[in-house]
């Protein structure tokens, strides 16, 4: 039989071409993957350009509405994104309104492509808000939220909210929203005024059916900064979020706040309410905790000062810091509506060496609980040069397990109480003596195993603006810990007064360091 050699060669060539095409297709499919580098490329190019302020496309009717009207606009539960997909995660979106008047672009990342999630009025129920559909046709979203069956297997609850500037909030099982985290803070508490970077675009990975985490990318922008972010959200009893950031500076900044946390403190036992209130405490957080690079643990109770106050802690390679809600008994709050006893602590667990810098605490006066008046962040000693990124990684814990956030060997501060200082007279009546008293209860660690007769003492110090007139320690049989009593006099009431204390047994330090600033004019 004659063989047509040309046809054989042609078939072989065709087979080779098909094989090569298949291999190329498989290689391309395998090689395509969205990553933080894609966002970083956008950020780097954006940083080279001058800043362009975002423009609002919001009709006046929505921009001028009151909060009660904004609450009328609810997401249509039947339209949750990924509703029909085999994944435990669902997405819902925030409508623009009030001061949420700048659209953010939201994209979905699949195994093969990136697609923008387009705004539609079908996503929302507008309640009694009358509007012209034509004016909001291409409006865009203000932000988004993530839902997950965190509390019950058959019910999706909100676990993440990303709305406004670079703010986001996360909750775990049995928690309610409290403090917020941010992508970046610039010039907080400086006379020049604070700059608020904003997330202008998001990319959300479509999760696989078996995924128990959600990956989110974000592009941050502001007059003097641009940033690429990767967030990995892990829902659970204590929800966690891994954060990777690459920040580029367009121009010099006075203060760069990395891993910022924002909270609220109105009053508590260390600073009782000036007006009669049935609540013993009203706050999202009651203290700043720091785990320094040298192993020291520091606890700084929060204040609501009459004037702006800033406290700094110089540290090299911090291991962690956070704004905590210590004390979970409902009797410490007594609020059935807002449940401050269920609000999570926020803890920054650093990854890698962060170098030299400061943990900074900013306390801002507030008359009520509607204002976030507490900010904590890390500010590096050395800022990146223009065009070069500041790269940072950390894990954010949203937790009610404060027991895990201090040394198991050392005792921690259970509570700080402030009172008018007094002395007991011969007739047993207490007489105010012009001092201020602080009572600090230390519990846990090795303290709980010590004999009540152990000669525990305190190492206490005070700044130049104060004088300690009493420094005593006694066993507390109720807590099985020790209570420190400090009575102090302020020299100049117009200035704040710094104090520090820790309990010791001989040369052995038994507790974390209690650090406190008595605000001016108190």
UniProtKB/Swiss-Prot annotation:
Keyword Signal assigned: yes
Gene3D superfamilies: 2.70.98.10, Immunoglobulins (2.60.40.10)
Superkingdom assignment: Bacteria
Matching Pfam families: MdoG
Keywords for this protein: Periplasm, Signal
Signal sequence range: 1-33
Gene Ontology CC terms: outer membrane-bounded periplasmic space
InterPro entries linked to this entry: Gal_mutarotase_sf_dom (IPR011013), GH-type_carb-bd (IPR014718), Glucan_biosyn_MdoG/MdoD (IPR014438), Glucan_biosyn_MdoG_C (IPR007444), Ig-like_fold (IPR013783), Ig_E-set (IPR014756), MdoG_OpgG (IPR023704)
Molecular function via GO: carbohydrate binding; catalytic activity
GO process terms (BP): beta-glucan biosynthetic process
Pathway it works in: Glycan metabolism; osmoregulated periplasmic glucan (OPG) biosynthesis
Subcellular location: Periplasm
Entry's family note: Belongs to the OpgD/OpgG family.
The protein's role, per its UniProt record: Involved in the biosynthesis of osmoregulated periplasmic glucans (OPGs). Seems to be required for pathogenicity.
Protein name: Glucans biosynthesis protein G
Taxonomy of the source species: Bacteria, Pseudomonadati, Pseudomonadota, Gammaproteobacteria, Enterobacterales
